[in-house]
Amino acid sequence: MLVSIEWLYNNLKDVKVVEIDYNPQISYYEGHIPGAVLINWRDFLSDNSRDFASPEKLSKVLGNAGINNDDLIVLYSDMNNRYAFYAYWILKAYGHSNLAILNGGIYKWLRENYPIDNDAVVVRRSEYKASKPDWSSRILVWELLSRLKEIVLIDSRSKEEYDGLTTAPPEHKCEQTQMSGHIPGAKNVPWTTLLNDDETMKSRDELGRIFSWLNREDRIVVYCRTGARASVVWYALKEVLGFRLVRLYDGSWVEYGNMVGVPVEKSISDHS
């Protein structure tokens, strides 16, 4: 599920490489992996509500990218590869199981001096058929609030966000919430602690030590600001370490930190 830079380079003709970008004009057109098609992160979202796309819309998005249902999709992204993990979580829910993530993403690809292209890839449209999503790995705020005492919460944001020093990370500093802090009982495991300096994911043994405080029977919920960073933690727990009961709260702090009447904890005093 995590493929190396070398493996991808040797298998470029046999897979569909997809770059998932938050800022496509900044990332993809400045240089991308040869043959990689671009999918804007927002294409996974619904046009009519704050939710994910319908199967019909997702089918069109993937079909326009020339992807077939049986293709092996290798994902990478900008923003420290976080949206590759988020896309993995979404696509798996919609029934595409033949998925992999480029370990280290575009950063490691460039760092090791592999070739890049600057022009958009011309693709032949395919007829993709997305399934009705299986959201068993997702939790909505209503259920979350009713189960706060039953679940193990992991906040994967930075310590500054978790403590309540800021309501948004530096890369999204204009997108503040009304409240700072964290969901009561949540333990802070910043997503970056799961990655090496070259942005590859740490080994199974290292991840096991990071999460040694968890029990296999725990019902785990991970969250961050919008779900992207939390998807890295979800992947490590579910796909690498094999925890069965892991769900992602994609509403995350953008939703929770703007809700009226919900409980909030802070690790600092609020003098406002």
Segments from the language model and where they lie:
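A mid-sequence, solvent-exposed acidic-amphipathic segment
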Residues: 153, 157-210
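Thiolate-centered catalytic microenvironments shared by cysteine-dependent enzyme domains
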Residues: 53-148, 165-166, 181, 229-252
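Helix-loop module immediately N-terminal to the HCX5R catalytic loop
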Residues: 43-73, 187-220
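Flexible, polar/low-complexity N-terminal or interdomain linker segments that lie immediately upstream
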Residues: 1-27, 103-178, 264-272
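N-terminal, Lys/Arg-enriched amphipathic/low-complexity engagement segments
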Residues: 39-41
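Short cysteine clusters
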Residues: 224
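Extended hydrophobic/aromatic segments used for targeting, binding, or gating
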Residues: 244-272
